[in-house]
């Protein structure tokens, strides 16, 4: 199963994360399939490629709780919901 999750790359006491699509069996900081965005919790700065995130979500990738909140803040989850409603019509 593919998950959209955070990969930590910052230094000690200075966390910085990449938002990645990765196989759920790979460890947190292991290989990933594709880079979707970044998250800096110290500056509360989130950069997400909305098109890539939507592509992975539509293909069945499961976001972790934290990533789901970040995607919601950026409007990606709303766009996914609207796309699903449009497909039903």
Swiss-Prot record:
Gene3D superfamilies noted in UniProt: 3.30.1320.10
A family per Pfam: Ribosomal_S16
Name the protein family: Belongs to the bacterial ribosomal protein bS16 family.
Q: What is this protein called?
A: Small ribosomal subunit protein bS16
The biological process GO terms on file are: translation
MF annotations from Gene Ontology: structural constituent of ribosome
Is Phosphoprotein included in the keywords of this UniProt record?
A: no
Q: Which GO terms describe its cellular component?
A: cytoplasm; small ribosomal subunit
Q: Which UniProt keywords apply?
A: Ribonucleoprotein, Ribosomal protein
SUPFAM superfamilies per the UniProt record, alphabetical: Ribosomal protein S16 (SSF54565)
């Amino acid at each position: 199963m593919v998950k959209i999750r955070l990969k930590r790359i910052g230094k000690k006491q200075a966390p910085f994360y990449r938002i990645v699509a990765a196989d759920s069996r790979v460890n947190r900081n292991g290989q990933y399939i594709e880079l979707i965005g970044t998250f800096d919790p110290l500056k509360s700065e989130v950069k997400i490629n909305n098109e890539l995130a939507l592509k992975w979500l539509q293909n069945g990738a499961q976001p972790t709780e934290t990533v789901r909140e970040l995607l919601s803040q950026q409007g990606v989850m709303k766009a996914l919901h609207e796309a699903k409603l449009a497909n039903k019509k």
